[in-house]
Amino acid sequence: MAQVTLTAVRKVYPNGAEALEPSSFTIPDGELTVLVGPSGCGKSTLLRMVAGLEEITEGELSIGDRIVNDIDPADRNIAMVFQNYALYPHMSVAQNMGYGLKNRGMDKAAISEKVREAADMLNLNEFLDRRPSQLSGGQRQRVAMGRAIVREPDLFLFDEPLSNLDAKLRNQMRIEIRALQRRLGTTAMYVTHDQVEAMTMADRIIVLNSGMIEQIGTPNEIYEHPASTFVASFMGAPPMNLLRGEASGGAVTLGGGQDVPFARADGHDGPIQVGIRPEDTWPDPAGDLAFDVDIIEELGAQRLLHGHVAGQAFSVAVPKDKSAETGAMKLSVKPGAVHLFDADKGRRL
C-alpha cells in the first residue's frame, strides 16, 4: 500500500498538444480514487503516466516515499487491470494468474499458494484449469484481477475494466471490485467515463474535462456542490437542469419574469445559470415554476417528465406511484437545492 502524490504533473505531446494541464493531488494510502470524464479529457493519459507508460513532461510523481518519474513501470510495484483482460489464450487460468510471479523467479510452490489465495477471494477455484475462451466475460475479468492481486502491489490501476461487460454484469463486478479493494486495503486509481461507476465506487472522485481537473471531492461533495456547470451536468443521472437566468438585487429570475424560489445571488447582478436537479423538484399545484410537459419516460421505479420551463429544456423525476400527464403544471423546488453558476465561465457562485 502507498500514498500517491502528483505535483504540477503535466503532459504535452511532441506536436504541442497539451493532454493534461499541470495537476496536483494526493491519493491517501488505501483510498480508491476514480478519474472520470468524457473521451479525450486526459483521464487515461494521467493513469498511464502513473503507470510509467507515458512520459511526464513536467512535474513530480511519487508512489509511497519514492519519486518515480524515471523509474521503469516494472519497478514501480503497481498492477494494472484493463478492459480487454489481456489474458494469454493458450494458458490456463492458474497460469495466467501466476505468470508475472513466474517471470520474477518465484518458486512454483509459492506461486501456487498465492494463486489459490486469490482464487478463493474471486471464486475462481473451479476454473483454474480452464482456458480464457471457456470463461464468461465476468470470469475473465476476475482472472485479470487475480493476476493483479497475486503481485501484492502498492497500487492498483484500473483502466475502464468494465467497459466490455453488459449492464447486469457491470453492476455485479462494480460491487465485487469495491468489496475486494476494501478487503485488501490497497490504494487504487480507477478510470471510467461512467458517472454511475464513479459515484458508487469512489472514496473520492476527480472530474476531468479537456485536460483540466474540474473538481476533486467525495461522491456526495461532487453531487451536492458541483464546482462548475460541467460537473453539474456530467455527474448525476438524469443530469442537472441548467437554465439561463438573470440576477438583480439578490433575486434570480428566468425568462418571462419567473422568480426562482430559494435562490439568492447576493453581490452578483447580470446573467446567471441556474441549476436544479430533476429529483429536487416535483409537481405541485401551489408551486412556483410553470412547467410544460412534452414527454413522459417510464423507467420502472420512477418517471421522467421532459418539457420546458421558461422556454428552456427541463426534466423532473417523480416516483412511479405519482400520476403525471403531458401539458401545463406547476412545480415546487426543494429548499437549498438551487445551484447558481457564473454565466460566462460556468463556475459555481
UniProtKB/Swiss-Prot annotation:
The keyword Cell membrane applies. GO terms for biological process: carbohydrate transport; glycerophosphodiester transmembrane transport. Residues 4-235 form the ABC transporter domain. It comes from the Bacteria. It is a peripheral membrane protein. Gene3D superfamilies: 2.40.50.100, Nucleic acid-binding proteins, P-loop containing nucleotide triphosphate hydrolases. It is an enzyme of class 7 (translocase). Pfam families: ABC_tran (PF00005), OB_MalK (PF17912). Coiled coil: none annotated. One of its GO terms (molecular function) is ATP binding. The keyword Lipid metabolism does not apply. It is found in: Cell inner membrane. ATP binds at G37, P38, S39, G40, C41, G42, K43, S44. Keywords: ATP-binding, Cell inner membrane, Cell membrane, Membrane, Nucleotide-binding, Sugar transport, Translocase, Transport. Its main location: membrane. Its EC number is 7.6.2.10. One of its GO terms (cellular component) is ATP-binding cassette (ABC) transporter complex, substrate-binding subunit-containing. It catalyses: sn-glycerol 3-phosphate(out) + ATP + H2O = sn-glycerol 3-phosphate(in) + ADP + phosphate + H(+). Part of the ABC transporter complex UgpBAEC involved in sn-glycerol-3-phosphate (G3P) import. Responsible for energy coupling to the transport system. The complex is composed of two ATP-binding proteins (UgpC), two transmembrane proteins (UgpA and UgpE) and a solute-binding protein (UgpB). Belongs to the ABC transporter superfamily. sn-glycerol-3-phosphate importer (TC 3.A.1.1.3) family. This is sn-glycerol-3-phosphate import ATP-binding protein UgpC.
